[in-house]
């Protein structure tokens, strides 16, 4: 029962991490305008994400434009795209494997493959969380380095957007949930197709012979020397 509760908790955390990873991938709030220097008072803010860049006006109007060229994008943005897409795909595969492998489901019940699916789902969640963590950490490091670069004008500096914070939280949930899924299957006994033989039955013990009454041994006695002599044959003939 305890391992089932751990599996449910791990799956719930991992599922929340998967949803957060999807939202992080879609949102354009990876970089936002840094209000420093001459940009302290401005009516326009710029947002940059993996797929589009947006302009936010003080009137509450958003204007977004999708990146039209893939090769014109910087390499760090292309790498972040690839990592986040792979992370989302792995999270979906991990969710399917975990549903099959959990004890509370009927899929593959009573087979050794059920535990294998649960461990595989946990491992895929771990890998997905790691890829998401690498992507958001790489982008955060790039934003911080550009922000403290004195050669860069203040109009080209950006701050950490809300999507990066969500990415850190989502990747942490995926890592924790995947770890719980893997640990919940660690203490289970291996599958055996036949019931194990008891220790008492494995050792052979000598059993006493069955009791027979004395009358049963009367006909089994060997003939005496006297009876053999009276039968017409002498014992000396056989020597």
UniProtKB/Swiss-Prot annotation:
List, alphabetically, the GO terms of the cellular component aspect.
bicellular tight junction; plasma membrane
Q: Which residues lie on this side of the membrane: Extracellular?
A: 29-81, 137-162
Query: Can you name one GO molecular function term for this protein?
Result: identical protein binding
**Which residue windows are transmembrane per the record?**
8-28, 82-102, 116-136, 163-183
On tissue specificity, the annotation reads:
Expressed in all sensory epithelia of the inner ear vestibular organs, as well as in liver and kidney.
User: What's in the keyword line of the UniProt record?
Assistant: Cell junction, Cell membrane, Membrane, Tight junction, Transmembrane, Transmembrane helix
The answer to whether the entry has keyword Membrane is yes
Biological process terms in GO annotation: calcium-independent cell-cell adhesion via plasma membrane cell-adhesion molecules
The primary location reported for this protein is other
Topology class, membrane: Multi-pass membrane protein
Cell location: Cell junction, Tight junction; Cell membrane
InterPro entries, per database record: Claudin (IPR006187), Claudin_CS (IPR017974), PMP22/EMP/MP20/Claudin (IPR004031)
Q: Which residues lie on this side of the membrane: Cytoplasmic?
A: 1-7, 103-115, 184-239
Is the keyword Membrane assigned to this protein?
Answer: yes
Task: Give the family from UniProt.
Answer: Belongs to the claudin family.
Q: What does this protein do?
A: Plays a major role in tight junction-specific obliteration of the intercellular space, through calcium-independent cell-adhesion activity.
Protein name (record): Claudin-14
Species for this entry: Mus musculus (Mouse)
* Gene designation: Cldn14
């Amino acid at each position: 029962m305890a391992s089932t509760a751990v599996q449910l908790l791990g799956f719930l955390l991992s599922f929340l991490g998967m949803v957060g990873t999807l939202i992080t991938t879609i949102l354009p709030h990876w970089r936002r305008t840094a209000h420093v220097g001459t940009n302290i008072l401005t009516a326009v803010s710029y947002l940059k994400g993996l797929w589009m860049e947006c302009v936010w006006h003080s009137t509450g109007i958003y204007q977004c434009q999708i990146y039209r060229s893939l090769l014109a994008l910087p390499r760090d943005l292309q790498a972040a795209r690839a990592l986040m897409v792979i992370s989302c795909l792995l999270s979906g595969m991990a969710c399917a494997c975990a549903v099959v492998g959990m004890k509370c489901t009927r899929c593959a019940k009573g087979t050794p493959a059920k535990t294998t699916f649960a461990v595989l789902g946990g491992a895929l969640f771990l890998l997905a969380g790691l890829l998401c963590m690498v992507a958001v950490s790489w982008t955060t490091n790039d934003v911080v380095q550009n922000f403290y670069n004195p050669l860069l004008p203040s109009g080209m500096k950006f701050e950490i957007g809300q999507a990066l914070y969500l990415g850190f939280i989502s990747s942490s949930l995926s890592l924790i949930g995947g770890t719980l899924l893997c640990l919940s299957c660690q203490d289970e006994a291996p599958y055996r197709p036949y019931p194990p033989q008891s220790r008492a039955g494995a050792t052979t013990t000598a059993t006493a012979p069955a009791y027979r009454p004395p009358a049963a041994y009367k006909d089994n006695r060997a003939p005496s020397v006297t009876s053999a002599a009276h039968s017409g044959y002498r014992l000396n003939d056989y020597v």
